Swiss-Prot record:
The keyword Cell inner membrane does not apply. Its EC number is 6.3.4.22. It comes from the Archaea. GO terms for biological process: tRNA wobble cytosine modification. GO terms for cellular component: cytoplasm. Belongs to the TiaS family. Keywords: ATP-binding, Cytoplasm, Ligase, Nucleotide-binding, tRNA processing. ATP-dependent agmatine transferase that catalyzes the formation of 2-agmatinylcytidine (agm2C) at the wobble position (C34) of tRNA(Ile2), converting the codon specificity from AUG to AUA. It holds the Pfam family TiaS_TCKD. This is tRNA(Ile2) 2-agmatinylcytidine synthetase TiaS. It comes from Methanosarcina acetivorans (strain ATCC 35395 / DSM 2834 / JCM 12185 / C2A). The gene is tiaS. CDD domains: RPA2_OBF_like (cd04482).
Length: 428
C-alpha cells in the first residue's frame, strides 16, 4: 500500500514530515516498510500553502489495509492543526493491485501539481473516477498533494531526487528556542559539501537548516545520498533528538521550472526558465529590492527581482547593463519574476574616457587648459581630446544563484550542476 498525506501543518506549527516519521514507526505493526519515505515539494507559488507546500508518501507491504487507513486517519485527527484556516488535510491510499494502472495517471498529476495549479475538485473527481480510497478534512485541499506524492512513489525512476535527514524535537520542547551548537553545522558543512548543501550560508554567517517556527523539526540536512546527509547529521551537537527520518525528495532539482520560448507565455503562479536582454537598468527600490526589466526577441518585457532576502545576490543584479544577454529561472507572482538563478551569457562592452598617452614617454598627458587639449609636460607632445577605451566589467559570464539563506526548496543548487560547458559561481 502507498499512503499519501498532505496539509496537516500550519504557519504556527506542526509538520507533515513529522507525522510521516511517526507513522513510519507505528505502521510496522501492520506491515513492512518497503522503501524510504518521500517528501514531495509542490508548486512554490501557490498562495494558500501553509509553509513549504510539501506532501509525503509511505510505502508498505501489508495484509491489513483497513487497519492502516484507520490508524493514519486517527493520527491526522490528532496532530493536524485543524484550527488553522489554511490547514485542510487529505490522505490517499493506493492498493498494490492498482499500482500498474495508476502509475501513468498519477505521474501526470504529480508533474502538474509541481508545475501548475490544480483545483481541489479536480483531485476529488480523479479520486472518485479511479476508485481510490481517501480521507479528507475541511475543504480537503490536502488531497492534491497526497495524490501527487503517491504519483511520485509509483514513479521513482521518472524524477531527479535528493535526500534530507530530518531530526525532530522532543514534544515538550515544541515552541521553545532550539538549543543547537552553531559551530557544529559549519563543521558538518566543511566535511560534506558539495555532497550536502544549504546547511549553512558562509557569506552571511547563517545556519539555514534550522527552522525558526514552532514546528517539531530540529534541523534538516539536504544532500545527494542518505549516507552523506546522515554523516553530516551525526556531526551536529544539539538538544536531544526524539526521532529522525531520511526522506527521498524532489528538493534541489528544478522540477518546478517550465521552459518559456517567449515572455508572452509566462503566467502568474508558475515557474520558468527563459532567455532575454536587459532592457531597463537595475534600480533599488524601497525595502532594498533590486528590480530590472528583460526583453525577449519578440519585444515582450517582464520585470525581474532580486528581493532583499537574496542579500549579496543583489550586488550581481546591480552590475547588469542595458543589452546584457541573460538566462533566468524563477517563479512569477504579480507579473514579476522572483529570480532563483541567473546565467550571464554575453556582456555588452563598457567604455570610459581617459587622457591620451604621450607617444614618446608613454605617460598620460595633462590638460593644457580649458579648450586647449592635452599636453605632455615632459616631452611637449599634444593631443586634442580624450580617448575612448574599453573598461573592465565587474561581472563575468557564467551561472549565478541566490545564497543558501534565500534558496527555495525546489531550486537546484549549483553544487549539483553537472554541465561542464558552463562556468558556475556557487553561492556559499
Amino acid at each position: 500500500m502507498i499512503i499519501g498525506i498532505d496539509d496537516t501543518d500550519s504557519n504556527e506549527g506542526m509538520c507533515t514530515t513529522y507525522l510521516g516519521a511517526l507513522l513510519l514507526e507505528e505502521l510496522q505493526e501492520y506491515g513492512t516498510v518497503e522503501t524510504l519515505p518521500l517528501l514531495v515539494r509542490l508548486n512554490p507559488t501557490i498562495p494558500y500553502k501553509t509553509r513549504g507546500n510539501a506532501a509525503i508518501a509511505l510505502k508498505l507491504k501489508t495484509d491489513c489495509p483497513e487497519k492502516i487507513i484507520a490508524h493514519v486517519t486517527s493520527r491526522i485527527e490528532e496532530f493536524a492543526r485543524m484550527e488553522c484556516e489554511k490547514t485542510n488535510p487529505g490522505a490517499v491510499f493506493i492498493q498494490e493491485k492498482d499500482y500498474r494502472s495508476l502509475k501513468p495517471i498519477l505521474l501526470s498529476f504529480l508533474e502538474k501539481a509541481v508545475k501548475d495549479v490544480i483545483e481541489i475538485e479536480t483531485a476529488k473527481h480523479l479520486i472518485s473516477e479511479l476508485g481510490i480510497s481517501s480521507k479528507s478534512f475541511k475543504n480537503g485541499r490536502g488531497l492534491i498533494g497526497a495524490l501527487a506524492a503517491c504519483g511520485a512513489m509509483l514513479n521513482p525512476e521518472k524524477w531527479d531526487c535528493t535526500f534530507e535527514h530530518l531530526a525532530y524535537r522532543q514534544k515538550k520542547k515544541w515552541g521553545s528556542p532550539r538549543d543547537v551548537n552553531k559551530d557544529s553545522f559549519f563543521e558538518a558543512d566543511r566535511q560534506t559539501y558539495p555532497g550536502t548543501w544549504d546547511t549553512v550560508d558562509l557569506a552571511n554567517r547563517l545556519v539555514v537548516c534550522v527552522p525558526h517556527s514552532a514546528d517539531p523539526v530540529l534541523f534538516g540536512i539536504r544532500g545527494e545520498s542518505p549516507e552523506l546527509v546522515s554523516k553530516a547529521a551525526s556531526l551536529i551537537r544539539s538538544e536531544p533528538v526524539e526521532r529522525f527520518a531520511v526522506y527521498r525528495t524532489n528538493q534541489g532539482t528544478d522540477m518546478h521550472l517550465l521552459p518559456a520560448a517567449s515572455i508572452s507565455e509566462i503566467r502568474d503562479m508558475h515557474s520558468y526558465r527563459f532567455e532575454g536582454t536587459v532592457s531597463a537598468v537595475p534600480k533599488t527600490i524601497e525595502g532594498g529590492h533590486v528590480i530590472f526589466a528583460v526583453r525577449d526577441g519578440k519585444g515582450d518585457e517582464i520585470d525581474c527581482a532580486a528581493f532583499e532576502p537574496t542579500k549579496n545576490f543583489r550586488v550581481l543584479a546591480r552590475r547588469l547593463l542595458l543589452g546584457d544577454q541573460i538566462f533566468l529561472s524563477g517563479s512569477v507572482t504579480s507579473g514579476t519574476l522572483n529570480i532563483e538563478k541567473m546565467q550571464v551569457k554575453e556582456l555588452v562592452l563598457l567604455y570610459r574616457e581617459e587622457n591620451p598617452k604621450c607617444p614618446e614617454c608613454g605617460k598620460h598627458m595633462k590638460s593644457a587648459g580649458q579648450g586647449q587639449g592635452f599636453r605632455c609636460k615632459k616631452c611637449g607632445t599634444r593631443a586634442s581630446s580624450k580617448i575612448r577605451c574599453e573598461a573592465e566589467r565587474d561581472l563575468e559570464p557564467g551561472l549565478y544563484e541566490v545564497p543558501p539563506c534565500a534558496r527555495r526548496h525546489l531550486a537546484k543548487p549549483l553544487a549539483r550542476e553537472r554541465d561542464q560547458n558552463i562556468r558556475i559561481h556557487p553561492s556559499r
